[in-house]
């Protein structure tokens, strides 16, 4: 067991290096970096100053010495290979550097924004599984019934609607866009949150998070529900279930004591992808749409502004979380089904 865990931890290193290397290479060829943006601002300021002072267009060139200072400020005065090795050295120490534009360390920004993304990700993840797993089991037990057909139609329609489209629709309907002002447009708490009672704080938080979570969760039901249904149907048709029924065991006992554990294995394997999807991919769209100040919005703004330390830092963090949850998923796989050995997973 411990040898398997050690091997998996060691394999995380080349994966992280590969992700950082690919991102670093892409950054070298993306136009409009921080130096170019700063030069444009200087040219714009010089033009406006010249037009105001002299009534004519000013010279828009920038002193080469200023450009050299900007490159030194953002670390672009060194060759790419040297910058690459310095980046790997810093990330090996978990030093993510400082933001170009926010005048804070990347770690402090992540710590500030992380609670919002965790809140959205956990709500989405747990609500998806708490609703979809029982629904999938009910559909498997009632396979082919009107209930099965109706719920399949509902979850597939929800799956077909992108989360950001549903979010826009919810804002238009319930956020004061064109109809009812029932929910707030942005943020997770009200301005007077600190003055509210404990019950008032809980209700205020749920009031703010209702629309973002609805937009994030609805499209996630179909995959987990249908996976649960198909896994249970596959197990129900197996010989050991027929044997258990022949012995006189009740349907509930057969379903929960024998079928449930085996049918849950595919779902456990999908936990990391579902968690990371809810934690990052979903939060990126939902946070941007609802102006929630989390890691998703921070990542989006950093890409737009070419704030490379924040881009690399958040990508490094999400990759690390994804690899760790994948390892935890494998451990849960063995915990649910003791017949599976770590030696088999290694092969």
Question: Predicted segment positions?
Answer:
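An internal, D/E-rich "acidic patch" concept
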Residues: 71-133
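Membrane-water interface segments at the C-terminal ends of transmembrane alpha-helices
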Residues: 23-29, 68, 153-186, 215-221
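Hydrophobic side chains within well-formed alpha-helices
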Residues: 1, 34-35, 80, 84, ...
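Hydrophobic alpha-helical transmembrane segments of membrane transport/permease proteins
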Residues: 16-82, 178-201
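N-terminal signal-anchor/signal peptide hydrophobic helix marking the start
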Residues: 6-12, 16
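Short, membrane-interfacial amphipathic segments enriched in basic
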Residues: 1-3, 77-82, 93-107, 143, ...
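Residue-level signal for discrete positions within transmembrane alpha-helices
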Residues: 12, 113, 117, 153-156, ...
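Alpha-helical transmembrane segments of integral membrane proteins
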Residues: 2-3, 114-115, 123-147, 163, ...
């Amino acid at each position: 067991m411990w040898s398997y865990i050690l091997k998996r931890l060691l394999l995380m290193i080349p994966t992280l290096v590969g992700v950082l290397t690919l991102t670093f290479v892409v950054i070298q060829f993306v136009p409009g970096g921080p130096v170019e943006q700063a030069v444009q601002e200087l040219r714009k300021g010089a033009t406006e100053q010249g037009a105001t002072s002299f009534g004519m267009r000013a010279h828009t060139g920038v002193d080469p010495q200023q450009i050299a200072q900007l490159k030194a400020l953002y670390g672009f005065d060194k060759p790419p290979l040297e910058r690459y090795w310095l980046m790997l050295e810093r990330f090996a120490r978990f030093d993510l550097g400082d933001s170009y534009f926010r005048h804070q360390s990347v770690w402090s920004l992540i710590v500030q924004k992380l609670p919002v993304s965790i809140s959205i990700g956990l709500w989405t993840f747990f609500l998806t599984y708490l609703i979809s797993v029982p629904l999938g089991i009910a559909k498997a037990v009632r396979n082919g019934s009107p209930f099965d057909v109706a719920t399949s139609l509902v979850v597939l329609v929800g799956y077909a609607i992108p989360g950001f489209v549903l979010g826009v629709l919810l804002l238009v309907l319930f956020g004061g866009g064109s109809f009812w002002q029932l929910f707030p447009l942005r943020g997770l708490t009200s301005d007077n949150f600190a003055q509210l009672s404990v019950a008032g704080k809980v209700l205020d938080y749920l009031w703010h998070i209702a629309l973002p979570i609805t937009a994030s969760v609805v499209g996630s039901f179909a995959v987990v529900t249908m996976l649960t249904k198909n896994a249970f149907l596959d197990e129900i048709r197996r010989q050991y279930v027929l044997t258990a029924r022949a012995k006189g065991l009740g349907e509930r006992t057969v379903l929960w004591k024998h079928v449930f554990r085996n049918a849950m294995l595919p779902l456990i394997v999908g936990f990391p992808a579902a968690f990371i999807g809810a934690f990052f991919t979903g939060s990126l769209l939902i946070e941007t749409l609802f102006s929630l100040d989390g890691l998703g919005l921070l990542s989006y703004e950093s890409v737009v502004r070419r704030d490379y330390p924040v881009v690399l830092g958040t990508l490094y963090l999400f990759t690390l979380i994804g690899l760790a949850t994948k390892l935890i998923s494998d451990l849960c796989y063995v915990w649910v089904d003791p017949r599976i050995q770590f030696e088999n997973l290694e092969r």
